[in-house]
Design a protein with these regions (language model features):
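Amphipathic, Lys/Arg- and hydrophobic-enriched alpha-helical face
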Residues: 37-55, 71, 134, 185-186
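Sigma70-family region 2
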Residues: 26-27, 50-54, 63-80, 99-103
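Short, charged helix-capping/linker segments at alpha-helix termini
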Residues: 3, 26-35, 45-63, 166, ...
Length: 192
């Protein structure tokens, strides 16, 4: 799977064959669902990569499509299939984030922080690309950055999705941008 550039199709612009393939897939046609998968996997993977990081992105992408297959009968065509799939992906990724957060509390956050600091010290001369920098953000800041700056959600929508205040969303976005600037500036200054 190519993790360098996710597909750029907009969630509100339907792919012409989607309507036919959705109807066929809803009646059990696995080849039609495979076509839907191929048409949308890049965008879902890109979202998973940015929201969850490189490690779990591929597995989470598969989880999204398994869930889509299971819930396909609930798709009514009121929105484009891409929009429905995107919403399903965001919901699954947010649920996974909550689950991982609970696990981290049990295991201890200190190990994660130490690992990140060690990784920064070991490779300071390497210019970091944006995807890597986004992956290094703390979970909350990364989620909000991806939802707002990458996916185009408004702070009000993010607040509703995550169950947080609009002000918290804005503060986390500011934090994410400052952290990204800190991650990227050393590479920009030293590398060019």
């Amino acid at each position: 799977m190519d993790d360098t550039a996710p597909a750029v199709d907009s969630p509100s612009r339907p792919v012409p064959a989607d309507a036919v393939d959705v109807a066929l897939a809803q009646s059990g046609d696995q080849q039609a669902f495979e076509r839907l998968y191929r048409a949308h996997v890049g965008r879902v993977y890109g979202l998973a990569l940015r929201m969850a990081g490189a490690g779990p992105a591929e597995e989470l992408t598969q989880d999204v499509f398994v869930r889509a297959w299971e819930k396909l009968s609930s798709f009514r065509g009121e929105a484009a299939f891409a929009t429905w799939l995107h919403r399903l992906a965001v919901n699954l990724l947010l649920s996974e984030r909550s689950r991982r957060g609970r696990e981290r509390l049990r295991l201890g956050e200190d190990e994660t922080v130490m690992d990140r600091q060690r990784a920064r010290r070991e490779t300071p001369e390497v210019a970091m690309d944006l995807d890597t920098a986004i992956g290094r953000l703390p979970d909350g800041a990364r989620q909000i950055f991806v939802l707002h700056d990458v996916e185009g959600y408004k702070h009000e929508e993010i607040g509703e999705m995550l169950g947080i205040a609009v002000g918290t969303s804005k503060a986390q976005l500011h934090r994410a941008r400052m952290l990204l600037r800190g991650h990227l500036e050393p590479g920009l200054k030293g590398g060019h």
